[in-house]
Swiss-Prot record:
Signal sequence coordinates: none
Alphabetized InterPro entries for the sequence: P-loop_NTPase
UniProt key word Oxidoreductase: no
Keywords: ATP-binding, Kinase, Nucleotide-binding, Transferase
Protein name: ATP-dependent kinase YFH7
Encoding gene per record: YFH7
Length: 353
């Protein structure tokens, strides 16, 4: 079993080490289907946030949110703006770029939009269209810390790769839609274009620095340091999740807020050495604030886990069908991950049998 408390300590130590140079740190957590990566990511996130809530309960009124950010960055200034007529055309086509659904070289574009909470934002879309959109909220109204419940302030946030599954209507437009649906979960059935763009955005925010008029000492805790270095000018970033009942992405399910100092990215292909996936590691590693974990587990153990999950999700009607679905798709994806793992030295391998 994975010691998630030890992982939490390692992540907080990285944040402490990098807090003068990085606004946030990232964690990559990769594993084959059924390896337990989602559960581990959720536990890790919960442990870190609970530790911070305990600190806040013992240190009331410690949080400061200031605007001393260096450098001031436009997170998507390099992206082309999608013109209104093209936005209308995309929406008319069910939020898709019909000619680009399989184009892994399609460059993400941006346009003005609204979040699901009706906040003004910049939407970033790629070959998966609006189903896999990233939405960056406008930075307008200053945060009033006094009006925030302290247990609502979370410094860690998970970002599952699942939200970047191409929608079923997107797969319908593939040259071979039958195979695309059958092999859903393989690398080509995710919007790798926009997930890489998300990593580029996160890297830019990571490299921002917030100065503080407080003098920190060697005895200052990491929670004390980060509590004095929240920034008003870091925007909220909304990313999609995945609804297993609807079998499609759901917009704005996760929010990487200005309080998020640890982003835990989990998924199958974040260390994959092909197409857009191969650029993710370097994009985040170049910030100097990244931890990378690969979960190793025997396929015999994952078969039963995944078969039961398929049955519970309604994808199959019997456990035997679940096992067959695992062998014809999930097992192939797991082996693909192992065969195409990027070759870098700092991947920490952990067992979860």
């Amino acid at each position: 079993m994975v010691d998630t408390h030890k992982l939490a300590d390692d992540v907080l130590q990285l944040l402490d080490n990098r807090i003068e140079d990085n606004y946030r740190v990232c964690v990559i957590l990769v594993g084959s289907p059924g390896s337990g990566k989602s559960t581990i990511a959720e536990e890790l996130c919960q442990i870190i946030n609970e530790k911070y809530h305990t600190f806040l309960s013992e240190h009331p009124n410690v949080i400061e949110v200031n605007d001393r950010l260096k450098p001031m960055v436009n997170l998507v200034d390099s992206l082309k703006t999608l013109q209104p007529n093209k936005v209308a055309e995309m929406i008319e086509n069910q939020g898709l770029f019909k000619d680009h659904v399989e184009d892994v070289n399609f460059q993400p574009v941006k346009y003005s939009a609204l979040t699901s909470n009706n906040e003004e934002c910049t939407a970033v879309v790629a070959r998966g269209g609006t189903a896999n959109a990233i939405r960056i909220a406008a930075v307008d109204n200053p945060v009033n810390v006094n009006k925030l419940a302290q247990d609502s302030i979370n410094i860690a946030q998970i970002v599952p790769m699942d939200g970047f599954h191409l929608s079923r209507r997107c797969l319908d437009l593939f040259k071979d839609p039958q195979t695309a649906h059958k092999r859903r979960g393989s690398p080509s059935t995710f919007d790798s274009n926009n997930f890489l763009q998300l990593c580029k955005i996160l890297a830019k925010t990571s490299l921002c620095k917030v100065s503080s008029h407080h003098k920190f000492y060697s005895t200052s805790s990491v929670f004390e340091k980060l509590s004095k270095t929240f920034s008003q000018t870091i925007p909220d970033i909304f990313v999609p999740g995945f609804n297993h009942a609807l079998k499609d992405p759901t917009p704005d399910q996760y929010c990487i807020s200005k309080f998020t100092r640890i982003v835990i990215l989990e998924g199958l292909y974040l260390l994959y050495d092909q197409e857009n996936w191969k650029k993710i590691y370097k994009t985040l590693a170049d910030t100097g604030a990244l931890l990378v974990y690969k979960i190793d587990i025997d396929y015999e153990a994952t078969e039963e886990r995944v078969a039961k999950r398929h049955l519970q999700s309604g994808l199959v009607t019997t456990i035997a069908e679940g096992r067959e679905k695992f062998r014809s798709n999930d097992l192939l994806n797991g082996r693909d991950i192992d065969n195409h793992l990027i070759k870098v030295d700092n991947i920490v391998h952990i067992r979860n049998d």
